[in-house]
Amino acid sequence: MPLSGEYAPSPLDWSREQADTYMKSGGTEGTQLQGKPVILLTTVGAKTGKLRKTPLMRVEHDGQYAIVASLGGAPKNPVWYHNVVKNPRVELQDGTVTGDYDAREVFGDEKAIWWQRAVAVWPDYASYQTKTDRQIPVFVLTPVRAGG
């Protein structure tokens, strides 16, 4: 079942504008950042309960997705990280296809595998990690089955 509730646009201009373009076009526009594919992640706000939409780099392998909470290597995790921790049911739009997923933070060997995949898609992730003392979180998304 798709997430429902009041939508609160991002306070960040670039994020809000890309999310708006993605949504208004039905996923036919706004699907790239610097020539690389992006997905649109919808989360439920940890504090507000409002829907938040965030464009993120598309990290996909054999039909499974991962999301990387890099925030460009900032000292703190992005706001959406806290939303996903509190409310792990998310919606992901990849182009014109939208689905519901359960997000699970990964660690150890599983994280290492997904980190390599993420860096292969967006090499800047590697430099982001060197800029921060925190370990950049990675979540793997599992599709929610009908009725789940």
Swiss-Prot record:
Top-level lineage group: Bacteria
Oxidoreductase as UniProt keyword: yes
Any Pfam family hit: F420H2_quin_red
Molecular functions per Gene Ontology: coenzyme F420 binding; oxidoreductase activity
Catalytic activity as recorded in UniProt: oxidized coenzyme F420-(gamma-L-Glu)(n) + a quinol + H(+) = reduced coenzyme F420-(gamma-L-Glu)(n) + a quinone
UniProt GO cellular component terms: peptidoglycan-based cell wall; plasma membrane
Keywords per UniProt: Oxidoreductase
Keyword hit for Transcription: no
Record-listed E.C. numbers: 1.1.98.-
Binding site for coenzyme F420-(gamma-Glu)n: 46-48, 52-57, 68-71, 79-83, 125
Its job: Involved in a F420-dependent anti-oxidant mechanism that protects M.tuberculosis against oxidative stress and bactericidal agents. Catalyzes the F420H(2)-dependent two-electron reduction of quinones to dihydroquinones, thereby preventing the formation of cytotoxic semiquinones obtained by the one-electron reduction pathway.
Miscellaneous comment: Was identified as a high-confidence drug target.
Family: Belongs to the F420H(2)-dependent quinone reductase family.
NCBIfam families documented for this protein: hi_GC_TIGR00026 (TIGR00026)
UniProt protein name: F420H(2)-dependent quinone reductase Rv1558
